[in-house]
Amino acid sequence: MAYVCLLEIHLHFPHNGSLKGKRKELSSLKSQLQRRFGATVAETDHHDLWQRSTLTAALVGRHARQLRDHAAGVERWVLGIYPEGARVEIRLVSTEDLDLE
């Protein structure tokens, strides 16, 4: 059995002044999440707002405990970069719980 962990990362950029600046910040963050943690990442909300963004990251693994620990590492890392401007929600499900056809 496999597990899927979804992390919804809500970000606030109070000092950012443009969509261009936001995109630059997000591009760097997404690349680092992919390199450091092997996460698949996409911007999933607030595309047209220059001070807010929501990213959704996915991690997949065979062991729920290891995946939880890995997700907690992602959360610590993101909160370390944005201590006052981030909130991370974590959801873990088994592939058996998904309605796959």
Locations of the language-model features?
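Active-site-flanking beta-strand signature of metal-NTP-handling nucleotidyl enzymes
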Residues: 4-11
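Solvent-exposed alpha-helix faces
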Residues: 27-31, 38, 72
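C-terminal structural segments of small proteins and small subunits
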Residues: 61-101
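A generic structural motif
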Residues: 13-18, 61-64
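Short catalytic/binding micro-motifs of nucleotide second-messenger systems
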Residues: 37-40, 81-82
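A short linear hydrophobic-aromatic micro-motif
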Residues: 39-45, 88-89
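C-terminal binding/interaction regions
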Residues: 22
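Short, charge-patterned binding micro-sites
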Residues: 42-62
